[in-house]
A protein has these predicted regions:
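Short aromatic-centered micro-motifs
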Residues: 10, 35-36
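Acidic, low-complexity intrinsically disordered segments
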Residues: 43-85
Length: 85
């Protein structure tokens, strides 16, 4: 799998979003993705279980002063999956 950074553009809440995704590391076959919006680091996400029971995307690390939109994280995760398909 290519771990080069890539751009995603998609619609979220009726607004176009542009996100840079930087795959940053791989541990035990799990890849972590740094998410950059407007050239600013927002958070690192990874696939995993949400609330311990359903598959989805979760935050592995975040910038303390940034708010987190859980719906946006799930949308970005789906877009990452689509990018690799």
């Amino acid at each position: 799998m290519d771990l080069s950074p890539f751009l995603l553009e998609f619609k979220h809440r009726n607004k176009m979003q542009s996100v840079e995704v930087r795959p940053c590391c791989k541990e035990e076959n799990v890849i972590y993705y740094d998410i950059w919006i407007d050239n600013q680091y927002q958070y690192t996400i990874t696939p995993g279980l949400i609330n311990g029971d359903k598959p989805g995307w979760r935050i592995a690390l975040k910038n303390a002063d940034k708010t987190v939109d859980q719906d946006l994280i799930q949308t970005i995760g789906v877009e990452i999956e689509s990018y690799y398909l």
